[in-house]
């Protein structure tokens, strides 16, 4: 499925949820389904042509048992339009669209040593200002190869203040 098509489905779900005043509840359901898909590899199951439509449809019926009316209608639309193989991608796109709407993002901070809680709070504040976000979750990744400094990555926007990069720039200027 193209990104444009998954965006259309996710936009439709978000619009209906907003109209019905159930946006927060739907986003919770979407997050739970994404987690369920990851833990049980359901995306691969739905995309695999070896399994019959009826087997895949049984999975959707199981999901419908605990879904809200809005989510049930959405899942039935996906099923009737033959998009079960794309459901995982559509759910991810829905989460991304909602994160954009509410200016929420995960921010990866790569550093040569683990960050303290105080440093994490400073990176949250910096990321909110630099990337115009309302809510930030900092994910600290330790990579000793950057020598010192840090690299901040949020949705493809990168701030590279690592010592390794600075040394490489100096070396390029000298040569």
Curated annotation (Swiss-Prot):
Subcellular location: Cell membrane
GO molecular function: proton-transporting ATP synthase activity, rotational mechanism
Keywords: ATP synthesis, Cell membrane, CF(1), Hydrogen ion transport, Ion transport, Membrane, Transport
Membrane topology: Peripheral membrane protein
Keyword Calcium: no
InterPro entries: ATP_synth_OSCP/delta_N_sf, ATPase_OSCP/dsu
Major place of residence: membrane
Keyword Transport on entry: yes
Any one GO CC term of the record: plasma membrane
The family this protein is said to belong to: Belongs to the ATPase delta chain family.
Family matches, as PANTHER family: ATP SYNTHASE DELTA CHAIN (PTHR11910)
Function: F(1)F(0) ATP synthase produces ATP from ADP in the presence of a proton or sodium gradient. F-type ATPases consist of two structural domains, F(1) containing the extramembraneous catalytic core and F(0) containing the membrane proton channel, linked together by a central stalk and a peripheral stalk. During catalysis, ATP synthesis in the catalytic domain of F(1) is coupled via a rotary mechanism of the central stalk subunits to proton translocation. This protein is part of the stalk that links CF(0) to CF(1). It either transmits conformational changes from CF(0) to CF(1) or is implicated in proton conduction.
Subunit: F-type ATPases have 2 components, F(1) - the catalytic core - and F(0) - the membrane proton channel. F(1) has five subunits: alpha(3), beta(3), gamma(1), delta(1), epsilon(1). F(0) has three main subunits: a(1), b(2) and c(10-14). The alpha and beta chains form an alternating ring which encloses part of the gamma chain. F(1) is attached to F(0) by a central stalk formed by the gamma and epsilon chains, while a peripheral stalk is formed by the delta and b chains.
Record's protein name: ATP synthase subunit delta
Organism in which the protein naturally occurs: Lactococcus lactis subsp. cremoris (strain SK11)
């Amino acid at each position: 499925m193209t990104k444009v098509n998954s965006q259309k489905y996710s936009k439709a779900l978000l619009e209906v949820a907003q109209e019905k005043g159930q946006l927060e509840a739907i986003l919770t359901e979407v997050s739970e389904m994404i987690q369920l898909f990851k833990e049980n590899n359901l995306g691969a199951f739905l995309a695999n042509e070896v399994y019959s439509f009826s087997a895949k449809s049984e999975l959707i019926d199981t999901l419908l048992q605990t879904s809200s009316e809005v989510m049930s209608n959405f899942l039935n639309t996906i099923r009737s339009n033959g998009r079960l193989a794309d459901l995982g991608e559509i759910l991810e796109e829905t989460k991304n669209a909602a994160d954009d709407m509410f200016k929420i993002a995960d921010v990866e901070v790569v550093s040569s040593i683990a960050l303290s809680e105080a440093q994490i709070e400073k990176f949250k504040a910096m990321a909110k200002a630099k990337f115009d976000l309302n809510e930030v979750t900092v994910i600290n990744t330790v990579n000793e190869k950057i020598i010192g400094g840090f690299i901040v990555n949020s949705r493809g926007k990168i701030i590279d203040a690592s010592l390794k990069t600075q040394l490489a720039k100096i070396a390029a200027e000298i040569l």
